[in-house]
């Protein structure tokens, strides 16, 4: 006697974790779900809760790498379903280190209003960048820049102060966790020297 299988299974990768989700539409008699990380000697057993809209189970503290996940359901008599195996790539520190941060490639002074334009590179998988800098009153300001932004204007800034950029990435569309890359530091320029025309002086 075979028990119904977990249907429409999706395994989302996270930072050293994974989330298993699926439909319980065929689990009329199933009581427990058995999840095995093939080749790692790790087996997890969890009760099936039909009061929830879908099945979900999180596996934490997993080393980054590629995993084959075998899923089986079992009824109260010990009968099991046919097992299904799925593949997932869990990411960690080493994988995150392969991504490029959002960087300032140029800082342009705007004479008209004494502001600065920050010119950005284009980097893959960037969700946003958190920019922190000091204004002319030495107040620390925080600015969130969209991942695909080409430039950002700073209307009020302190000359020769430090500006920091924290890049936040999502490794894939199905990834669970947004991860921060190491913070980059930049020194803002000095106030430009404006030469006064001498034509009106004797």
Briefly describe each language-model feature range:
Residues 1-28, 79-124, 174-201:
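Pro/Thr/Ser/Gly-rich low-complexity, intrinsically disordered linker/stalk tracts
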Residues 17-19, 43, 67-70, 96:
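Residues in flexible loops and secondary-structure boundaries
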Residues 57-90, 151-188:
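Beta-strand-rich modules
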Residues 104-184:
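Solenoidal tandem-repeat scaffolds enriched in leucines and small polar residues
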Residues 21-23, 36, 58, 70, ...:
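Beta-strand residues in well-ordered beta-sheet regions across diverse protein folds
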Residues 52-53, 66, 101-104, 161-165, ...:
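Short C-terminal domain-edge/linker segments immediately following a structured domain
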Residues 11, 26-65, 130-160:
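Recognizes extended acidic, P/S/T-rich segments that occur
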């Amino acid at each position: 006697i075979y028990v119904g299988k977990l249907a429409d299974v999706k395994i989302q990768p996270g930072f050293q974790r994974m989330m298993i989700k699926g439909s319980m539409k065929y689990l009329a008699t199933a009581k427990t779900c058995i999840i095995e990380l093939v080749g790692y000697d790790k087996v997890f057993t969890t009760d099936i809760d039909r009061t929830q809209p879908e099945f979900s189970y999180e596996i934490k503290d997993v080393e980054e790498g590629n995993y084959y996940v075998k899923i089986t359901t079992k009824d109260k008599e010990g009968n099991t379903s046919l097992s299904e195996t799925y593949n997932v790539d869990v990411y960690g520190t080493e994988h995150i280190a392969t991504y490029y941060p959002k960087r300032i490639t140029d800082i342009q002074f705007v004479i008209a209003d004494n502001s600065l334009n920050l010119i950005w590179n284009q980097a893959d998988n960037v969700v946003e960048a958190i920019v922190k800098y000091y204004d002319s009153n030495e107040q620390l300001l925080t600015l969130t820049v969209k991942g695909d932004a080409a430039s950002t204007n700073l209307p009020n800034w302190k000359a020769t102060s430090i500006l920091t950029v924290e890049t936040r990435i999502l490794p894939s569309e199905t990834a669970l966790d947004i991860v921060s890359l190491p913070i980059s530091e930049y020194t803002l320029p000095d106030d430009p020297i404006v030469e006064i025309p001498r034509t009106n002086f004797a």
